[in-house]
């Protein structure tokens, strides 16, 4: 039977595609050097240089093997002999490499090297440049066997293409640069996270692969805290009808009790089941809707759903079982997917404009990196008011962002971001804040910058549609998800119409703004 093929995308800061530090084993240390504590030397998956014949002591795989010696062929033989070959794949072996320091023998590699600026924080990487080695080690049972005691848990299920999108590890020797070509979070002193423009790169690469007809589905690997935003963005903008599954891990591959390897196996089973639920996350055997998926803590089992009304769609079982299906628009039904976005978005830049302003957001079917909107989040907390004057100028962060946005819009022809907006996280469920915040965000709205209001932290219900007519109510989305939907909405609808004096809009300018708010609200009510 021909196996189906799955695309495996490498995303940024991905613990699931990381490994523990390669520390020199005791077998690679001189007797006058620091010894690692413990009765056993640690082992690291490595490839053989040449074939070697080894003798394996009989009945040493389990304490009760000898107790059942009668069921073994030739039970009196002391050892089994086997030839190990390089093409077998990696074997767990002592790690004996040493760091060059100018001395004749070098020095052991240590975990502390990652904190030492004088040696370039160790000069090595432990993220995988793509998932190929990760998959090979899972198949080789380096970190555990399948339920039936065998290996090749991935290879038996499907074939794979490994696609570097915004990978966590990179080839510095080939000119790749951290923060531009790849995105690690360790060593922490030189960690980098993706830039806003990189979201367009991810969108284009994943979309082209997933629409190529070559794949049964795709797996996206990313950092556990930010996976939720990428998946919801993909759920909104990818016009696909096959499954994209996000996977993360709380512990690196190869570390004790790693959970990511199992999540990958389960993601493959979900894809091969043929169920199509849009973009989902698969963590700890549960299938999460991208819209409600959220990380709560860095321990296995601590992903949850937001919004207060569901979000776990099913379980991988076995068998894969789907209990609920998303009711909101996603992927091929989304109104903001890439196919439905115009090549040039048209909007009235000012309420009294006679003709629309247009901005090119796509080159053919590819999203332009420079048009990714800049959306900033503002939060309300009790006792934040400075006075009773509701003075917007007291909200210096909001006012500075408005000024920065207007300045960048004036330079959009030079490649500066043309779209800006705000997400306001207020009280639950009303999404209210201080009077000064309200007035500052009103100025933002009449400066052409869409504003969305959401409830605090992990909302348990929808924001009531009352209070601030100059802002969209963000349904039961949390602030991070509302930000992604606002970004996608701006690519479809453009900026809000500016007032000549944003502090004192005319009735006509208010009507123009409220019409724009309504168009945005329709998207937030259905996605």
Model-derived features with residue positions:
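Active-site histidine-anchored catalytic micro-motif
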Residues: 2-527
């Amino acid at each position: 039977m021909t196996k189906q093929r799955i695309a495996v995308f490498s995303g940024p800061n991905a613990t699931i595609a990381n490994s523990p530090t390669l520390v020199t084993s005791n077998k690679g240390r001189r007797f006058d050097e620091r010894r690692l504590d413990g009765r056993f030397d640690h082992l690291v998956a490595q490839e053989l240089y040449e074939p070697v014949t080894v003798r394996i002591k009989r009945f040493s795989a389990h304490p009760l093997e000898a107790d059942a010696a009668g069921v073994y062929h030739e039970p009196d033989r002391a050892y089994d002999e086997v030839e190990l070959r390089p093409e077998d794949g990696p074997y767990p072996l002592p790690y004996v490499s040493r760091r060059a320091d100018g001395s004749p023998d070098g020095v052991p590699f240590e975990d502390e090297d990652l904190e030492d600026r004088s040696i370039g924080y160790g000069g090595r990487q432990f993220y995988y440049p793509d998932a190929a080695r990760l998959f090979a080690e899972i198949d080789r049972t380096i970190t555990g066997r399948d339920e039936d005691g065998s290996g090749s848990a991935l290879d038996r299920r499907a074939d794979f293409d490994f696609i570097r999108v915004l990978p966590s590890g990179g080839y510095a020797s080939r000119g790749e640069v951290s923060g531009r070509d790849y995105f690690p979070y360790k060593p922490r002193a030189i960690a980098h996270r993706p830039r806003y423009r990189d979201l367009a790169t991810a969108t284009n690469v994943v979309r082209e692969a997933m629409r190529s007809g070559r794949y049964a589905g795709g797996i996206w690997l990313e950092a556990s805290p930010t996976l939720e935003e990428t998946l919801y963005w993909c759920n909104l903008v990818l016009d696909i009808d096959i499954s994209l599954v996000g996977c993360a891990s709380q512990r690196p591959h190869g570390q004790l009790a790693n959970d990511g390897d199992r999540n990958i196996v389960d993601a493959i089973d979900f894809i091969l089941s043929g169920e199509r639920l849009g973009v989902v996350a698969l963590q700890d055997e549960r299938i999460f809707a991208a819209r409600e998926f959220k990380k709560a803590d860095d321990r296995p089992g601590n992903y949850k759903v937001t919004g207060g009304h569901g979000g776990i769609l099913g379980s991988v079982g076995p068998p894969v079982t789907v209990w609920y299906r998303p009711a909101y628009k996603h992927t091929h039904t989304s109104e903001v997917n890439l196919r439905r976005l115009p090549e040039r978005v048209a909007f009235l830049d000012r309420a009294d404009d006679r003709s629309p302003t247009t901005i090119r957001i796509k080159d053919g079917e590819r999203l332009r990196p420079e048009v990714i909107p800049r959306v900033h989040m503002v939060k309300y907390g009790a006792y934040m008011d400075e006075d009773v004057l509701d003075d917007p100028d007291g909200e210096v962060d909001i006012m500075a962002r408005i000024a920065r946005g207007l300045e960048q819009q004036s330079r959009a022809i030079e490649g500066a971001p043309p779209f800006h907006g705000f997400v306001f996280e207020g009280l639950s469920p009303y999404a209210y804040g201080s009077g000064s915040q309200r007035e500052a965000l009103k100025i933002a709205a009449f400066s052409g910058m869409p504003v969305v209001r959401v409830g605090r932290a992990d909302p348990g219900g929808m924001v009531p549609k009352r209070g601030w007519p100059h802002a969209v109510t963000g349904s039961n989305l949390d602030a991070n998800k509302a930000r992604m939907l606002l970004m996608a909405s701006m690519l479809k609808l453009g900026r809000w119409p500016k007032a000549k004096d944003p502090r004192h809009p005319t009735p006509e300018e208010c009507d123009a703004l409220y019409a724009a708010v309504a168009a945005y609200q329709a998207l937030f009510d259905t996605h």
